[in-house]
Amino acid sequence: MTSQLAGFKGTRGTLLVGIGGCSSSGKSTIAKLAVQVLEDAVLVHQDDFYRHDDEVPFDEEYQIGNWDVPEALDMAQFERELDHIRATGRPAAKLVHNGNIDDVGKFGISEEYLEELRRRYRGRISQPVVLVDGFMLYHDDKVAARFDCRLLVRAPYATMKARRASRGGYKTLDSFWQDPPFYFDKFVYKSYAATHARLFRNCDVEDRLVAPDVQEIYNGDEAQITCVLEQVLDAIAAAQC
């Protein structure tokens, strides 16, 4: 984070953009690509607010920690960070990312294309931007309200489950976590459905998004990553003051 902040010119006019979604929806990858295009932007990962391993809620039935509930995060610290950004236009330099993000190089996006996007959006996005990606951005109104622009990245259940299964594991503050075979269904998706149901028609997270202040970004396997990226950039441009 410190290196990202070196050239960031954030001011009190900084646009605070949330890029939320279920684990393996692709939100972190999209956020990482977007920050490469934006002229004056920095990226904050909610994953960096996870608690220590022994503080994560313990599930008695499955005898493992539950990393996918709000209580697994230090939400008070996260909210203070959002308030700090809103007050100063800049994230706290002390934040250090844990590196649990797929390499965006696998998409084969050329530097020429990224430069074309930079030229295209330079005149459309003039405010400094802080992007925040996370899996618990819109479960609580008081957290969601802190964002100037709220984007929700979606993908079908089966797609997200397959993506999650392909990951080797995750670095935590104290160790390395690998999903048990049942983890996506019983923890990841179950928690996402429970905490985000109110945003959808019939409280079904596979149904239509109906929350008026949250914009859907579809990122299924059939979606072209370049189109998804441009949709995010268009949404940020439209959210400017």
From Swiss-Prot:
Positions contributing to ATP binding: 21-29, 163, 167-169, 213-215
Binding site for substrate: D47, D48, F49, Y50, W67, D68, R164, G169, Y170
Domain of life: Eukaryota
Enzyme Commission identifier(s): 2.7.1.22, 2.7.1.173
Function: Catalyzes the phosphorylation of nicotinamide riboside (NR) and nicotinic acid riboside (NaR) to form nicotinamide mononucleotide (NMN) and nicotinic acid mononucleotide (NaMN).
UniProt catalytic activity: beta-nicotinamide D-riboside + ATP = beta-nicotinamide D-ribonucleotide + ADP + H(+); beta-D-ribosylnicotinate + ATP = nicotinate beta-D-ribonucleotide + ADP + H(+)
Binding site for Mg(2+): S28, D47
Keyword ATP-binding listed: yes
Pathway this chain belongs to: Cofactor biosynthesis; NAD(+) biosynthesis
Gene Ontology biological-process annotations: NAD biosynthetic process; nicotinamide riboside metabolic process
Active site positions, chain numbering: D47
Endpoints of the signal sequence: none
Keywords for the protein's UniProt record, in alphabetical order: ATP-binding, Kinase, Magnesium, Metal-binding, Nucleotide-binding, Pyridine nucleotide biosynthesis, Transferase
Gene Ontology cellular-component terms listed: cytoplasm
Top-tier EC class: transferase
UniProt protein name: Nicotinamide riboside kinase
Provenance organism: Eremothecium gossypii (strain ATCC 10895 / CBS 109.51 / FGSC 9923 / NRRL Y-1056)
